[in-house]
């Protein structure tokens, strides 16, 4: 794994951290207590600003544990942090649970920041595209089950 230096402005307790060696995402925390009613969304401050190097992007992803336990997700997941952005990273959280409110204490881990290299595509105009086996099929066109049916 290559190291990429990312200049970061944050109070020490808000500094993004990898929970385990080899993790792809560094945890982002909330600066203040957050209360979300069922179906409610809120822009949550992390107190973190980064200067991603040219050629890199940051993706702000939901944390699977919050989704599984509380139905908490990110409205625009993944959020995109471009290399030229210097503002605070905010996370647009949403409580998808139809019945239970969610409370997060200040300092709770709310999202993961994944930093990856960017490949800049060159979009070339053409009259048509090559045929493939999949063709124009989308939205479930490849089926649901990955397992072959079991004869009974």
UniProtKB/Swiss-Prot annotation:
Disulphide bridges: none
CDD domains reported for this sequence: trimeric_dUTPase
Domain of life (superkingdom): Bacteria
Functional pathway: Pyrimidine metabolism; dUMP biosynthesis; dUMP from dCTP (dUTP route): step 2/2
Pfam assignment, any one: dUTPase
InterPro entries: dUTPase, dUTPase-like, dUTPase-like_sf, dUTPase_trimeric
Cofactor(s) recorded in Swiss-Prot or TrEMBL: Mg(2+)
The keyword Magnesium is annotated on this UniProt entry: yes
Catalytic activity as recorded in UniProt: dUTP + H2O = dUMP + diphosphate + H(+)
EC number: 3.6.1.23
Molecular-function GO term, any one: dUTP diphosphatase activity
GO biological process: dUMP biosynthetic process; dUTP catabolic process
Keywords: Hydrolase, Magnesium, Metal-binding, Nucleotide metabolism
Classification via PANTHER family: DEOXYURIDINE 5'-TRIPHOSPHATE NUCLEOTIDOHYDROLASE (PTHR11241:SF0)
Family stated for the protein in its record: Belongs to the dUTPase family.
Entry-linked NCBIfam families: dut, PRK00601.1
Its biological purpose: This enzyme is involved in nucleotide metabolism: it produces dUMP, the immediate precursor of thymidine nucleotides and it decreases the intracellular concentration of dUTP so that uracil cannot be incorporated into DNA.
Annotated protein name in UniProt: Deoxyuridine 5'-triphosphate nucleotidohydrolase
Gene name of the record: dut
